[in-house]
Swiss-Prot record:
CC annotations in GO: cytosolic large ribosomal subunit
Signal peptide residue numbers: none
Lineage per the UniProt record: Bacteria, Pseudomonadati, Pseudomonadota, Betaproteobacteria, Nitrosomonadales
Organism: Methylobacillus flagellatus (strain ATCC 51484 / DSM 6875 / VKM B-1610 / KT)
Gene from which the chain derives: rplQ
Biological processes annotated in GO: translation
Highest rank taxon of the organism: Bacteria
Protein name, UniProt field: Large ribosomal subunit protein bL17
Oligomeric and partner information: Part of the 50S ribosomal subunit. Contacts protein L32.
Single GO term (MF): structural constituent of ribosome
Any Pfam family hit: Ribosomal_L17
Similarity-based family: Belongs to the bacterial ribosomal protein bL17 family.
């Protein structure tokens, strides 16, 4: 019986799943947009959104908690110095999951995961804010 089991197993052991979600959260916070399968994207949302909420309050305890979950100093710095202030007025809903077709090899549903209100790059490489 699967009563009260709230997360997807994704055909991985618990340590592999934890490492994969940690790496995906690091990639998302670094690049602000990633492409992955739809079930992984939905699980990533459960990991990444609380981290961004944590980044809105830059205390030492929150930095240590974020580092224990991400294990990357550069990403923790970006989380508290750049992403936290950016989403200070937003109460949740920091990620957008867009379905983008199916993968060629196995027909798995794919999705783009991106941060809402991220600055978009123009064609000439300048940063343009999203309207």
């Amino acid at each position: 019986m699967r009563h009260r089991n709230s997360n997807r197993k994704l055909n991985r052991t618990s340590s592999h799943r934890q490492a994969m979600l940690r790496n995906m959260a690091n990639s998302l916070l670094r690049h602000e947009i990633i492409k992955t399968t739809l079930p992984k994207a939905k699980e990533l949302r459960r990991v990444a959104e609380p981290l961004i909420t944590l980044g809105k309050d830059a205390t030492l305890a929150n930095r240590r908690l974020a580092f224990s979950r991400l294990r990357d100093r550069d990403i923790v710095g970006k989380l508290f110095n750049e992403l936290g202030p950016r989403y200070q007025t937003r109460n949740g809903g920091y990620l957008r999951i867009l379905k983008c077709g199916f993968r060629v090899g196995d027909n798995a549903p794919m999705a783009l995961v991106e941060l809402v209100d991220r600055p978009e790059l123009a064609t000439d490489g300048e940063v343009v804010t999203a309207e």
